[in-house]
């Protein structure tokens, strides 16, 4: 299936009026990753899944090459627990990590986006059983979810299931009849978040995974110090070095290694492949 994400008009930050791209066109923007719910419904995907006895949908929404599509551990936990929603988390590195916070509110699993989490709350710490000081809100959402199809079908019938969140953005628009490109945020965009379904779920499972194994996002420009193409490649290279070393292959520290997912999804599959005894140069493994 291929289907389009929905859109919402952008409004002026000062007076709430809808911004215009031209005299006959509204300034429209994507309605957030939560727009997936209405898109799945409107495209007929959910009904098709029910008719073909597809009970579970896997969902990953960010540029993360280490996200394993249909992760067997996540799917297994989800099915064995008969969950409506299951999700992966990693431990936060810093209080101000730009990732969502998975929390319990009145014993209900919920998500608070980093932009909506007060700094003093994010910085709170606690002491674990080993006497180590840890962040109180440590569970970082990495946007890997598994949903029950029946749950999504139920939620798709509830027009109020996903509220809209305001996002201050810079939007090119008409001003006094001229098209202008502001240098500071001038508009509000309306976005829905898929994790706002969590409070509606009867059973939610949260699975912690290792950052070095499951999370190498590409979100920032090259000049940034984290979540760039360069840092993503470095994380992948370190992981593949470990895989190869643990299978008995000697790998030169300076060699850049990449393993195509069709060649091996994990170390267990890699062990079944014919591998060189030593790698000294940059190497790409593929079928």
Residue ranges of model-derived segments:
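Conserved N-terminal catalytic core of the sugar/cofactor nucleotidyltransferase
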Residues: 1-54, 242-287
């Amino acid at each position: 299936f291929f289907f389009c994400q929905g859109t919402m008009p952008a409004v002026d930050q000062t007076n709430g009026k809808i911004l215009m791209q031209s005299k006959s066109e509204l300034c429209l923007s994507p309605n957030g990753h939560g727009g997936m719910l209405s898109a799945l419904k409107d495209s007929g995907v959910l009904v098709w899944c029910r008719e073909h006895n597809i009970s579970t949908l896997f969902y990953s929404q960010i540029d993360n090459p280490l996200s394993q599509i249909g992760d067997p551990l996540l799917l297994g936990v989800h099915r064995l627990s008969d969950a409506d929603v299951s999700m992966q988390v990693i431990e936060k590195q810093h209080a101000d990590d730009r990732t969502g916070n998975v929390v319990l509110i009145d014993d209900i699993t919920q998500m608070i986006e980093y932009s909506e989490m007060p700094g003093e709350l994010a910085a709170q710490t606690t002491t674990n059983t080993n006497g180590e000081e840890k962040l109180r809100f440590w569970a970082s959402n990495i946007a890997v979810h598994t949903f029950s199809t029946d749950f999504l079908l139920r939620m798709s019938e509830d027009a109020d299931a996903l509220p809209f969140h305001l996002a201050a953005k810079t939007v090119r628009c008409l001003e006094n009849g001229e098209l202008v490109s502001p240098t500071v945020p001038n508009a509000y965009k309306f976005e829905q978040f898929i994790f706002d379904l969590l409070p509606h779920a009867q059973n939610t499972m949260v699975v912690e995974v290792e950052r070095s194994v499951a999370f190498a996002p590409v979100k920032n420009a090259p000049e940034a110090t984290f979540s760039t193409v360069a840092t993503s490649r470095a994380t992948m290279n370190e992981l593949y070095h470990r895989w190869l070393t643990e299978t008995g292959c000697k790998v030169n520290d300076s060699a850049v290694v990449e393993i195509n997912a069709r060649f091996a999804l994990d170390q267990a599959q890699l062990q079944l492949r014919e591998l060189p005894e030593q790698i000294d140069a940059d190497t790409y493994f593929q079928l």
